[in-house]
Amino acid sequence: MKIKTFGLLMIILLSGCSSLQFNQNQTHTIIDWVDFVKLNGNMYTSDWGIVLKHENDVAEEVGEVSFTVDEVVTDPGYRTKDGDAAFLDIGTKLYRVKGFGTDELIAVADDTRVNGYKLYIQDQFRSSMINRYDEIPKDKVNSIGLYCDNESKPYKTLTGKDINKFIKLLDDGVYSPNYSPNMNNGDPLYYLMVFYTDDPIGNSFSIADDSQNVYFYPDSTRIVDSEIRDWIEQ
C-alpha cells in the first residue's frame, strides 16, 4: 500500500494530474504528504539540511498559504494549486530570501528552526544546493553553530582555529554503516551542527551521542573520536 501511495503522491506533486478514474463508492486514500508549498506554479519542499544564516536575510512577503491539504484531501487525483501546502496553516506568510529568487527558495517563520525560519527549496533548484557533508567548501567556513534539537539559537559558536580542529575530528571519523546506537541509557542526545560561509544560508547536519559513541551521518554513519564531546557538550 505504501508503494502505491508514494507513486500516487509523485503523480500529484510532479505532474499535478492523474488519469485514474474513481467511482463514488471507492474508499478514499490516506495520502502521506511531503512537506510542500506551491507558489507561482512552482513546487517547494522543506529541507532540514539548509538553514537561514541571519534573520534579517528574510526579505519581502511573496505570498501566503490559502489551503492545507493534509487530512483534508483524500483524492489521489487532486491537482495542487498555488497557495496549497501540506502542513502549513492557512494564512502562513511566505517570504523571499535575500540572494535568491522566489523561484529558487522561500522562507516561513518557525521558532523551532535555526534563526526562526524554515526554508523551502524549489524542486528543480534543489540539485544546485549542497546536500552532502563532503560537498561543503570547508576552507570557506567562517563559523560553526551548535544547536540543541528544535532550538533557534546556538548554545555554542565555533570560530577561528576551533573550526579546523572540529572539522578534522569529523573528517577523521570511521565509517560504520551497520552501527546500531546504544540504547541502554535511553535515547541518544541529538545536536545540530551548522556550517556557515559568507552565503545567506548554512548547511546543517545532526550529530548524536549515545553515551558509547558520538556519530553523525555525512552519507552513512561515521563514528567520531570521543574528544569531540569537549566541543558539543553544553
Task: Kindly give the residue locations of the regions a language model identified.
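C-terminal motif of bacterial Sec signal peptides marking the signal peptidase cleavage site
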Residues: 13-16
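Positively charged n-region of N-terminal signal peptides that target proteins for export
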Residues: 1-7
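Function-determining sites in protein domains
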Residues: 18-234
